[in-house]
């Protein structure tokens, strides 16, 4: 999470992709301390570093990445959109 930003569900899917059993992935994600709002802000910044988005477009992209509506709105606001 220091290198790449993830939503909770996105991180679970990434761990499953890396061949961790679903139950283990869920357990791991539920037992770490993560500010999901800050992860959304980090992911929003990553997107804006490579392309341009409208506020609504970036919120939709973050929701596609499995951030909640509130997390997506926080992230987009944090980067100034």
Which residues fall in each region the model found?
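An alpha-helical, amphipathic repeat domain used for nucleic-acid recognition
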Residues: 1-81
